[in-house]
Amino acid sequence: MSEYASSIHSQMKQFDTKYSGNRILQQLENKTNLPKSYLVAGLGFAYLLLIFINVGGVGEILSNFAGFVLPAYLSLVALKTPTSTDDTQLLTYWIVFSFLSVIEFWSKAILYLIPFYWFLKTVFLIYIALPQTGGARMIYQKIVAPLTDRYILRDVSKTEKDEIRASVNEASKATGASVH
């Protein structure tokens, strides 16, 4: 247990060091006499608690906001990078996010069947949004690819698929354009 606590303490110290130049967090730290990491963790906990309790039905908008902000930022950053290493992660995320948005048309029925749906959705979206967890890669490999591969290039043999992929990758390297 002490390993776990020391790991969290170390990460919080790293957070405080990394954001020591942030003016807003510095002002909050000066006013409250609490480290930046405690403030951010407390605000994150309060945010998740509001989603969990779903007072006045705000859980839906807070969940969607949390599920949009970080992936949107990462997507904008990915558009500026020449490599396509992060594209599968982000595209998988947006596929799952869109699928959940379509399902939520029946949100009253979902909330009846799954009482803490917005909280569970938020935790799940954060899990697949963070590249460190590998959640989107796992979802892609276990669910998305097996369901969609049979419809994409379904009339093409494996050899032809490999040739197509190789020529696309070759063209990508020659032109410097990224392949998605």
Swiss-Prot record:
Protein's UniProt keywords contain Thylakoid: no
Coiled-coil regions listed in the entry: none
Membrane topology term: Multi-pass membrane protein
GO CC entries: cell periphery; cellular bud; cellular bud tip; endoplasmic reticulum; endoplasmic reticulum membrane; endoplasmic reticulum tubular network; Golgi membrane; membrane
Residue spans crossing the bilayer: 36-55, 58-78, 89-105, 109-127
Main location as per UniProt: endoplasmic reticulum
Topological domain spans for side Cytoplasmic: 2-35, 79-88, 128-180
Subcellular location: Endoplasmic reticulum membrane; Golgi apparatus membrane
Annotated knockout phenotype: Cells have more than three vacuoles with a grape-like assembly.
Residues the record lists as N-acetylserine modifications: S2
Region Interaction with YIP1, residue ranges: 2-17
InterPro entries for this protein: TB2_DP1_HVA22 (IPR004345)
Lumenal side: 56-57, 106-108
Assembly and interaction partners: Oligomer. Interacts with YIP1.
Similarity comment text for this entry: Belongs to the DP1 family.
Protein function: Required to generate and maintain the structure of the tubular endoplasmic reticulum network and the vacuole. Induces high curvature in membranes and causes membrane tubule formation. Involved in membrane/vesicle trafficking.
Note: Present with 1759 molecules/cell in log phase SD medium.
Domain observations: The short lumenal loops between transmembrane domains 1 and 2 and between transmembrane domains 3 and 4 may impart a wedge-like configuration, thus deforming membranes.
Protein name in UniProt: Protein YOP1
Organism in which the protein naturally occurs: Saccharomyces cerevisiae (strain ATCC 204508 / S288c)
Lineage: Eukaryota, Fungi, Dikarya, Ascomycota, Saccharomycotina
Gene for this chain: YOP1
